[in-house]
């Protein structure tokens, strides 16, 4: 199973799309978490596109819903571990997404350097996309 990060969904929903998700992961293996849903849908200005994206995201299996206190605390631990290791993790939300992925033993498919840093200090299974 693969948790697809916001950085990938942005490229999928972009018009014209810069990538096809199916080239990188079987759609039946895709899951999400609510922080990804929020990040994806909050970026839409057009109401019709927002509605389509919202329906698409909420049709996916959702892990860690509702998110429990220990997920947030683990995310904080990841952020702090990165700082101790001299790594810059720019987004606390990425730590939250990574914490959820680690807890459920999911790969994270992304185009975001934060996950590369988190993978260096944790058991995160990071799968970075290369966009052309």
Give residue ranges: language-model regions.
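Histidine- and aromatic-rich ligand-binding microenvironments
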Residues: 4-5, 33, 90-91, 128-132
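Active-site neighborhoods of divalent-metal-dependent phosphate/nucleic-acid chemistry enzymes
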Residues: 19, 62-109
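Short, well-structured N-terminal submotif of metal-dependent ribonuclease cores
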Residues: 1-35, 42-55
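Acidic active-site catalytic centers that drive phospho-/nucleotidyl reactions
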Residues: 5, 94, 112-114
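Generic structural signal for small/hydrophobic residues in well-ordered secondary structure
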Residues: 5-6, 40, 75, 101
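Active-site-proximal, substrate-binding regions of enzyme catalytic domains
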Residues: 48-68
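Short, hinge-like loop/turn segments at secondary-structure boundaries
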Residues: 47-51, 83, 125-129
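Acidic, PIN/NYN-like endoribonuclease modules and their adjacent C-terminal/linker elements
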Residues: 102-132
């Amino acid at each position: 199973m693969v948790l697809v990060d916001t950085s990938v969904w942005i490229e999928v929903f972009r018009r014209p799309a810069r990538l096809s998700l199916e080239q990188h992961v079987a759609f039946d293996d895709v899951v999400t978490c609510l922080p990804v849903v929020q990040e994806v849908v909050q970026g839409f200005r057009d109401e019709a596109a927002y509605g389509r994206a919202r329906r698409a995201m909420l049709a996916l299996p959702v892990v860690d819903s509702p998110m429990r206190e220990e997920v947030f605390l683990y995310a904080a631990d990841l952020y702090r571990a990165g700082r101790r290791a001299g790594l810059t993790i720019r987004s606390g939300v990425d730590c939250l997404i990574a914490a959820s992925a680690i807890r459920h033993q999911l790969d994270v498919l992304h185009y975001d350097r934060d996950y590369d840093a988190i993978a260096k200090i944790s058991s995160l299974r990071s799968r970075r996309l290369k966009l052309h």
